[in-house]
């Protein structure tokens, strides 16, 4: 009986696509309203002044301005704010 029995297939062999999360704009950069600042899972960063949060926790600019990262409150939350651009250089 020189036959080889069929081997079982591997249970691995697949992977999910990368989700391209992370910071898209850094502190001090000038961005237009509607631009994505951070794509994240959960609230690693919180929305501050002039920043909105999408249903997938993406942070985006509500106004044209300069991005600023700050730590706020007793809980030391990492917060993103956008200081409105008025036309003069920062």
From Swiss-Prot:
<protein>
    <recommendedName>
        <fullName>Large ribosomal subunit protein bL27</fullName>
    </recommendedName>
</protein>
<dbReference type="GO" id="GO:0022625">
    <property type="term" value="C:cytosolic large ribosomal subunit"/>
</dbReference>
<keyword id="KW-0687">Ribonucleoprotein</keyword>
<keyword id="KW-0689">Ribosomal protein</keyword>
<dbReference type="InterPro" id="IPR001684">
    <property type="entry name" value="Ribosomal_bL27"/>
</dbReference>
<dbReference type="Pfam" id="PF01016">
    <property type="entry name" value="Ribosomal_L27"/>
</dbReference>
<dbReference type="InterPro" id="IPR018261">
    <property type="entry name" value="Ribosomal_bL27_CS"/>
</dbReference>
<dbReference type="GO" id="GO:0006412">
    <property type="term" value="P:translation"/>
</dbReference>
<dbReference type="GO" id="GO:0003735">
    <property type="term" value="F:structural constituent of ribosome"/>
</dbReference>
<comment type="similarity">
    <text>Belongs to the bacterial ribosomal protein bL27 family.</text>
</comment>
<feature type="region of interest" description="Disordered">
    <location>
        <begin position="1"/>
        <end position="21"/>
    </location>
</feature>
């Amino acid at each position: 009986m020189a036959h080889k029995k069929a081997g079982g297939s591997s249970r691995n062999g697949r992977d999910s696509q990368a989700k391209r999360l992370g910071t898209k704009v850094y502190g001090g950069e000038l961005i237009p309203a509607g631009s994505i600042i951070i794509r994240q899972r959960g609230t690693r960063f919180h929305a501050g002044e002039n920043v909105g949060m999408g249903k997938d926790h993406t942070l985006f600019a509500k106004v044209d301005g300069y991005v600023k990262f700050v730590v706020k409150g007793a809980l030391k939350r990492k917060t993103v704010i956008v200081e409105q651009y008025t036309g003069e250089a920062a």
